[in-house]
Amino acid sequence: MTKDIIDIVNSFKHHQLQYGLGGDPEQEELYKWKLVTDQIGHPDVNAVDFAKEINSLSLKNLCYSTQTTAIRHFAEYEPEEYRKTFVGLFDENIGLQERIDKFISDCRELWDGKIKHNFTQKTSAMCDERLISFFLTLKDPTKYTFYKDEVYGSLCNLLGEKKKSAGQKLVHFYELLNNHVIPAVESDTELIDSINKEIDAKGYVHSTPLIAQTALWNYARYVRNNDKTQIWLFLGGKDADDYHFEEMYS
């Protein structure tokens, strides 16, 4: 692990010890643990009513509002075909990159072939790595966490890594997280103990990848607030509804 990563984790620890995950009004992160805990294991591919299963999901600001609309249209028009795409996505016997590629391809094909004609305006499947990371995190938060392009980009910059092209970023992000950030988090027992005490009091799920992602998001916010030349495509907190779709294709 690099000194920069250790410094980021240490900085996040100091913030955690001062505010906790839910005590800073400018950076409230506890909601992510609640959201995962409330919805872990969903969408359930064995649910009798898969449309209802999809419609019950709460994505909050972890995905784009248009993606919430899109997945509900999938559920409305082709729930059984949509179910099949998740069966493949959640098959851990298949490599993650292959699952991502197929999920994106199948969703686009399903949308273009059977759903798009229901709308007069131009639409798309709105299926990208950010949405996929949401589904994977709910499936297994001990292995996966949420993806944001700016967090991935800042991590690549720190490690001197070249960013992958769209469609290959999520796997690369998880690799960097597992190789560099998670070990730094796991070695900081003071940080782990503080977070575990807070989430245990609420009965929330444990997730080291989510801690690592939150530490990186803490750093990304710092960079955003201190580098006026940096253009951020998603603004969290009070600006959580300010979306820019170039992030999805960069």
Regions found by a protein language model. Give the residues of each.
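Short hydrophobic alpha-helical segments that form membrane-spanning helices or hydrophobic packing faces
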Residues: L131-T137
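Compositionally biased, charged N-terminal/linker segments
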Residues: Y222-S250
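Short, solvent-exposed loop/turn segments at secondary-structure junctions
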Residues: T137-K143, D239-D241
